[in-house]
């Protein structure tokens, strides 16, 4: 869309530039005599003759007069219509009246000026040029072009739009980087590259080594790597291999050696009387008062006011027990009266009288060797004992879990059995007696029959069938009904079954008794 708009703008400007011009005609008139000059200039149309609007200007003797006409705007013509009238200022005599049509040009016509011969025999010289208005270009000032620094274009002297220096493309949007960016970045502005990570420079030609690489370069032009230059070593290439010979950092007879693992790049091997990173501290000042004089758990012993000695643990040696010896007696330095022996994984120095390494006491030698091996055997026994204890604890936990589960199952079955007996009690009691359902009452009432004999009526109310209609419990006597239950206060519930026995009665009343 942007390219299409730019194309339309260009076409519109071309149409305007071919038909319209804008500017001012500048004149430069010189005369050997003082005269009045009345010019009439028509840049975009033809003039018939000098008119009343023409203004006479005074040209001093041998003093050129430079002035401009009014600004014109309209059709751009190839030639300018110029009328000149020369007047003598005192008598107003017309000395010359001429008409010229010079070609329009933005440069002065100094090579071919207009020469006007007066009637008094002297000549008046006239030069002119076409001075274009702002944004108009070309000899006829008919090319309209606006420079735009934001869009990176400018206008030539002829009004042709062109890209500014450092830009290219149809829309002047492509920056130019002289020499490119070495395929390690992209050009974002004239001669300005945006480099990829790990590269730098005007053209991204510099490979950046790893951060902290002091005296090194990239390995095979690969960023974030470090290859030391000649004469330097170390992970950061900050150790000069000539440091021992040039600086001589070890004092008091210490021997300097290159050590790339050290922060200083070297290591001092001090004589016995001095200590420190540069062998500058006398041993007499340290003695056993300082912490960790003896390394690796060695014991410090003060020999006198100026000397100390480190008694090292098994497997370590050296002046300060700083050397670990793992099964190698060649690196051990045992003192007089001691012998290096391999005990387990360590090489140790043992006094000769303690080991009793003599041919006439082989039994004691064997006992001494067994004594050194005893700690390893004890350690194995302790490990086996710990494993046995763990297994025993695990077995106890399993047995306890089984017991708890069994007890829970027994309790569950006992509870279910008891609940079943309570839910379904037996219907017969001992002695053949019948246990009736729970009842609420045994109301009895008497009525008189027609003969005067009493009639007994017994109502047995089953607690489980109390909801039935009254009187429905007796099929044999439908005309007699039990009194309705008291609806305000129900009878109390019985807590036990009631055994109803036979009701005593007279022999003659047996026929009238109904249940």
Curated annotation (Swiss-Prot):
Which spans are transmembrane here?
Answer: 393-413
What residue ranges lie in the Cytoplasmic compartment?
A: 414-515
Chain positions covered by the region annotation Disordered? 427-452, 466-494
Keywords from the named record: Cell membrane, Cytoplasm, Developmental protein, Differentiation, Disulfide bond, EGF-like domain, Glycoprotein, Membrane, Notch signaling pathway, Nucleus, Repeat, Signal, Transmembrane, Transmembrane helix
Q: Which of the residues are on side Extracellular? A: 27-392
Segments forming domain EGF-like: 173-205, 203-238, 240-280, 284-322, 325-349
Annotated S-S bridges: 132-141, 145-155, 163-172, 177-187, 181-193, 195-204, 213-218, 228-237, 244-256, 250-268, 270-279, 288-300, 294-310, 312-321
Describe the effect of residue 159 to E.
In wy755; egg-laying defect due to, at least in part, the absence of muscle plasma membrane extensions, known as muscle arms, on type 2 vulval muscles (vm2)
| Compositionally biased spans, kind Low complexity | 431-452
One GO biological process term is: Notch signaling pathway
Q: Does the keyword Glycoprotein apply?
A: yes
List cellular component terms (GO): cytoplasm; nucleus; plasma membrane
Tell me how this protein sits in the membrane.
Single-pass type I membrane protein
Signal peptide location in the record? Answer: 1-26
Task: Output the superkingdom of the source species.
Answer: Eukaryota
Location relative to the cell: Cell membrane; Nucleus; Cytoplasm
Q: Which PROSITE patterns does the record cross-reference, listed alphabetically?
A: DSL, EGF_1, EGF_2, EGF_3
Domain DSL per the UniProt entry, residue ranges: 130-172
**What GO MF annotations does this protein's record show?**
Notch binding
- Asked if the record carries the keyword Membrane, the reply is yes
Pfam annotation, one family:
C2_N_APX
What if the gene is knocked out?
Answer: RNAi-mediated knockdown in the L1 larval stage causes an endomitotic oocyte phenotype; effect not seen if knockdown is targeted to germline, rather than somatic cells. RNAi-mediated knockdown alters ovulation. Spermatheca calcium flux is altered by RNAi-mediated knockdown. RNAi-mediated knockdown, on a lag-2 mutant background, induces the presence of 1-2 extra mesodermal lineage (M lineage)-derived coelomocytes. RNAi-mediated knockdown on a lin-15 mutant background, causes adjacent vulval precursor cells (VPCs) to adopt altered cell fate.
Q: Which residues are glycosylated?
A: 123, 200
Describe its function: Probable ligand for lin-12/Notch and glp-1/Notch receptors and involved in the mediation of Notch signaling. Involved in the lin-12/Notch pathway signaling of cell fate in vulval precursor cells (VPCs), acting redundantly with dsl-1 and lag-2. Contributes to the establishment of the dorsal-ventral axis in early embryos. Involved in the specification of the blastomere cell ABp fate, probably acting as a signal from the P2 blastomere to the glp-1/Notch receptor on ABp and ABa.
- Kindly provide the name given to this protein in its UniProt entry: Anterior pharynx in excess protein 1
Instruction: Supply the source organism for this entry.
Output: Caenorhabditis elegans
| Species lineage | Eukaryota, Metazoa, Ecdysozoa, Nematoda, Chromadorea
Name of the gene this protein is made from: apx-1
